[in-house]
């Protein structure tokens, strides 16, 4: 068997400079306010090298200096901060029911947000979405200030092409998301699985201390169920097509048919869809209207026994699946996201008990 040879190239001075600038931006974002001396301590670089890179970041408008920060008296030290207004980013979250798109600054603060229904053929939908984004940008922002577009979608992603390989819940296959949106928006487009994007966002912008928590499991409970994994502070995405969806690990080979074509996937027991369907199997006999997950949770919070029971069963299955992953991955933190967290006081004790049992 022959093995395909890898391509190598020499790393030049410009490559090293770009890498160092990226490292500095990440460090400043994570620990701002931070001094040049602290950057030198963290990176092991000489003070002169640190100052040269920092000055370049300041010149490019990505970082600014200030004196608001910890001081031990005397002349206040100079600290570095991310310039949140240096550029904007477009964020798009394509969901099964609706799609949310937003404009954020360099610090991740959302400036504008809109939502549209996810409907129609993929190409028609993406072009219509681009029209709405264009309208928002033209009315309130300068296009020159935008750096890139980030897109999160449920399903299997080809990161090299920015295409959706397969999204059973969306019923999209081989959809060239990057190609369509780059052509229309004239910006670089990056496509990622929704659970992976959520895990990365939690690490960067959530309440978790990034410096102390280096391994994190994110469980995204939406129409389907996805997982994102951070190990040693880095998103683990596996091969070109992803690490694999733990939401499609089978916990009952004789269970219900999943949208992926297999039976008894974790998703068929613990997703929003599973929770709602469980509720309706009981209430349909009583002639109650079909509810979404938010309405179901509202009923549960008011004491509706059938809604409570449906959520509690979901919590049992969530806890069971998370326990299996925890015992194999040993994350320092587990985060659950999605609409179902509106029922957190109901489901959290059950999930926790299941994990620790």
What are these regions (language model features)?
Residues 92, 148-152, 156-274:
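Phosphate-binding/catalytic loop of phosphoryl-transfer enzymes
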């Amino acid at each position: 068997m022959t093995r395909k040879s890898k391509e190598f190239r020499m790393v030049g001075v410009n490559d090293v400079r770009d890498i160092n600038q990226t490292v500095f931006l990440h460090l400043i974002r994570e620990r701002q306010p931070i001094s040049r001396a602290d950057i030198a301590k963290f990176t092991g670089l000489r003070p002169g090298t640190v100052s040269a890179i920092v000055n370049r970041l300041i010149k490019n408008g990505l970082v600014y200096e200030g004196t608001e920060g910890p001081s031990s008296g005397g002349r206040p030290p100079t600290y570095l901060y991310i310039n949140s207004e240096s550029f904007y980013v477009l964020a798009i979250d394509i969901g099964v029911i609706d799609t949310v798109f937003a404009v954020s600054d360099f610090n991740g603060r959302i400036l504008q947000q809109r939502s549209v229904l996810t409907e129609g053929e993929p190409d028609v939908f993406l072009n219509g979405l681009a029209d709405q984004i264009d309208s928002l940008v033209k009315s309130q922002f300068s296009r020159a200030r935008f750096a890139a577009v980030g897109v999160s979608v449920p399903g299997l992603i080809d990161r090299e092409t920015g295409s959706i390989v397969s999204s059973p819940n969306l019923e999209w296959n081989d959809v060239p998301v990057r190609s369509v949106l780059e052509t229309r928006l004239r910006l670089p487009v990056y496509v990622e699985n929704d659970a992976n994007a959520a895990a990365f966002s939690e690490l960067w912008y959530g309440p978790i201390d990034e410096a102390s928590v280096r391994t994190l499991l994110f469980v995204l409970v939406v129409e389907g169920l996805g997982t994102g994994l951070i190990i040693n502070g880095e998103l683990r995405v596996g091969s070109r097509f992803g690490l694999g969806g733990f939401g499609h690990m089978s916990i009952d080979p004789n269970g219900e048919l999943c949208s992926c074509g297999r039976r008894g996937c974790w998703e068929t027991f613990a997703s929003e869809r599973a929770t709602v369907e469980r509720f309706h199997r009981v209430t349909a006999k009583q002639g109650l209207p079909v509810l979404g997950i938010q309405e179901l949770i509202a009923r549960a919070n008011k004491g509706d026994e059938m809604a409570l029971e449906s959520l509690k069963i979901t919590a049992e299955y969530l806890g069971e699946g998370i326990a299996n992953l925890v015992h194999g991955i040993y994350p320092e933190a587990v985060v659950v996201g999605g609409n179902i967290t509106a029922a957190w006081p109901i489901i959290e004790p059950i999930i926790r008990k299941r994990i620790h049992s």
